[in-house]
């Protein structure tokens, strides 16, 4: 019988088999990476939480997904310090082929917490999310998750906190 848990020669830990229907993994946690300065694609580790923690803003560039090696990998972003200059930004490496699809819920924090949708459709061709700390979101408490679901295609979900006349965070 195949081993239920093993470490392969490529340093991949395998838990269960293709017929496993349930697995408990105790003590599993995600790394939290400070995004207090720009983070290049090579330093954007998958299944991590990036903490936008600098009022000067920062940019995290997601790795190129064109070769299929990113499929199934997710990147999460939480704003703990509102950007007051520049912006908190999430960008795709290949802005010619890669695209964001999905939806960000916007909560307008200065007008009875009105909620609106900020959809990203495939035809929109969005390649970055720009949170300016006010109208485009990125106020402390904003959350975004980006998951590569296919070659050159990233699914976005989250809730961003905005103020003023809210505008799309997608570019």
Can you say where each PLM-predicted feature lies in the sequence?
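Small/polar residue-rich beta-strand/coil "junction" motifs that cap repeat-based extracellular fibers
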Residues: 1-30
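A general structural signal for short secondary-structure junctions and capping/turn motifs
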Residues: 4-6, 16, 67, 134-137, ...
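Residues that act as N-cap/strand-start positions at coil-to-secondary-structure junctions
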Residues: 9, 54-56, 140
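Extracellular disulfide-bonded cysteine-rich modules/repeats
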Residues: 11-14, 140-148
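A residue-level signal for beta-strand positions that form part of recognition/binding surfaces
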Residues: 12, 22, 49, 143, ...
